Every structure is written in structure tokens, then in C-alpha cells.
């Protein structure tokens, strides 16, 4: 490993960008990834039907920071793309994050107006809140609405992803998708929302295209790396490594699950190709 100044474990977005930054500072960089492809969870490919597929689920690049979008624009052309999502509840489609349209979808006009009025009165300067906040609200109408969403969506969806019962869900997980207090649609509210014109793999290839970067795939890095805590050394292939090690993988694996395994949510992908122009009301429906 004497030939390298930096070893980066993981060739996802963080690993690729860090490698590029070091390479531009004239550092020799080696990237290891256990997968047989670059791009991490952003990896995409064209399938046998000519469809560009995001192998690990849909990914939209989004940020509020102009300088970040300017940076990624050095490595790819981008097309504006505002992601919209929805949910099927009791056989009816409604947008997510849930908004005032959701109230209209599941309550009669009189009750819907009462709930929306209560929300406006209780949250005059707020655009959204978490379901946890609404579940604990003193107003009965607001609390009832939150209970409906929790019972029919949040608890089921989250429990399925994390593989636990609704009662075992960590409250912090329920804060990820807020409830909106307006009719706004769109999953993100960031100014910059884009998809690469070509593909994410093309974007990653351009980031990694540098004479100071070497990529090795199908490598179990943790089989070759040892953290010598007694001597405060990094040991690679039984030799001390005096360079920089950047690790972007699962933190519990790095420490050999010394403090137990961390919980991770998971998905099972089933690929089906339909011979129709449009299959559902939004790009993502849960």
C-alpha cells in the first residue's frame, strides 16, 4: 500500500467525491468497494427493455446549496426533476408528504374544513409538523387526523421497512416525513432538484476519471484492514499504513459489531415490466 496516500472504502457518492478531492490535491487514491459496481446505492443500468433502472430504488439529487449543485455539474449534465410521491390508503391515492389534499380525500367537506381550520389556528406560522407532534396535540381534531395517518400509513410502512411491530418503532424514525399544512406537492422543498441527463453511473465515471484514482471492486476491505487500538495504527494486509483511511461503510461493521449490530431498514425489490406508458399516479407510490 506504499503507492497510495489515501485509501477510501466505499465507492458511493461520499467515497467518490472524497477520492476526487484528494486526487486533485495530488494524492494517490485507492478506492475499495465490496460490490461489483461503482455508485453505491445510486447505481443505475439499462435493462433488457431499454429502461434506465435505479437498482436500489429511485434517487433524486436535491440540495438547497448552490455550490453543491455547481460542483456536481462539473461531472454531468442535469435535468430538472421535481419528485412527487403518493400513498395508497384504503384503496385511495393521496400525495405524500401528506397535505391538505389528504384531509379532503378522507373526510367529508364539513369535517375536512374543521380539521384544516384547527391546524391553521394552532400553527399560524408553520408549514409542517411531524406526525409525533400531532399525535400528542391537545386539539382533538388534529390528534384524530394524526391517529388516522399513523394507523393507516406511518406505523404500517415504517414497521414493514424496519421489520418490527409498530410499538417497537423508534420515535425518531417517524420524524422523517412531515405532514404539510397546505396543498403543496413534491417530496422535497429544495431549490435544486435534478436527475442526470445520462445516468448516475456516467456521473460517477466522470468523478472517478482521474489519473490519481484507482478503483478496485469486489473487495472486502474489512478483511484487509485492522485497527490496532493498542498502537494507534492502521494495519492493511498485515503492514502498517501511514496514509489516510476514509471509511464510508456501515460503522458497526468497522468495529466488528463490538457494541452490537445497528438496526437498518430494508427493502425487497421485485422487478416487473408493464407494456403501458404509465402505470401509477406518481413516480413513487407506497
How should each PLM-predicted stretch be described?
Residues 23-48:
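Glycine-rich FAD pyrophosphate-binding loop
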Residues 42-45, 98-100, 259-260:
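Short aromatic-enriched loop/helix-cap "lid" or pocket-rim segments at secondary-structure transitions
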Residues 222-286:
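Mid-domain catalytic core of redox enzymes
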Residues 4-31:
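N-terminal Rossmann-like FAD-binding beta1-loop-alpha1 element of flavoenzymes
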Residues 9-11, 32-34, 61-64, 152, ...:
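Short His-Asn-centered micro-motif
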Residues 13-15, 36-39, 101, 221-223, ...:
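Short, solvent-exposed loop/turn segments at secondary-structure junctions
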Residues 49-122:
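Dinucleotide-binding Rossmann-like beta1-alpha1 core, especially the glycine-rich loop
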Residues 90-94, 101-244, 255:
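Active-site/ligand-binding neighborhood in enzyme catalytic cores
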Amino acid at each position: 500500500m506504499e503507492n497510495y496516500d489515501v485509501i477510501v472504502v466505499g465507492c458511493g457518492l461520499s467515497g467518490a467525491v472524497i477520492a476526487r478531492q484528494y486526487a486533485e490535491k495530488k494524492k494517490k487514491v485507492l478506492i475499495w468497494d465490496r460490490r461489483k459496481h461503482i455508485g453505491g446505492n445510486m447505481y443505475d443500468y439499462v435493462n433488457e427493455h431499454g429502461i434506465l433502472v435505479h437498482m436500489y430504488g429511485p434517487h433524486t439529487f436535491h440540495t438547497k446549496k448552490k455550490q453543491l449543485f455547481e460542483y456536481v455539474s462539473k461531472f454531468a449534465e442535469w435535468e430538472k426533476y421535481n419528485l412527487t410521491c403518493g400513498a395508497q390508503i384504503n384503496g385511495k391515492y393521496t400525495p405524500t408528504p401528506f397535505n391538505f389534499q389528504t384531509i379532503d380525500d378522507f373526510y367529508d367537506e364539513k369535517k375536512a374544513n374543521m380539521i384544516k381550520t384547527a391546524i391553521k389556528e394552532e400553527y399560524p406560522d408553520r408549514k409542517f409538523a411531524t406526525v409525533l407532534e400531532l399525535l400528542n396535540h391537545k386539539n382533538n381534531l388534529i390528534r384524530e387526523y394524526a391517529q388516522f395517518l399513523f394507523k393507516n400509513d406511518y406505523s404500517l410502512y415504517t414497521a414493514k421497512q424496519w421489520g418490527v411491530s409498530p410499538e417497537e418503532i423508534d420515535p425518531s424514525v417517524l420524524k422523517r416525513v412531515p405532514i404539510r399544512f397546505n396543498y403543496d406537492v413534491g417530496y422535497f422543498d429544495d431549490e435544486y432538484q435534478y436527475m442526470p441527463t445520462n445516468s448516475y453511473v456516467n456521473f460517477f465515471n466522470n468523478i472517478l476519471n482521474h489519473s490519481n484514482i484507482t478503483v478496485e471492486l469486489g473487495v472486502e476491505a474489512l478483511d484487509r484492514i485492522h485497527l490496532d487500538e493498542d498502537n494507534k495504527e492502521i494495519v492493511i494486509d498485515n503492514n502498517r499504513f501511514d496514509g489516510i483511511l476514509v471509511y464510508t461503510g456501515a460503522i458497526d461493521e468497522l468495529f466488528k459489531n463490538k457494541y452490537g449490530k445497528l438496526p437498518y431498514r430494508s427493502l425487497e425489490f421485485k422487478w416487473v415490466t408493464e407494456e403501458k406508458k404509465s402505470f401509477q399516479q406518481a413516480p413513487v407510490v407506497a
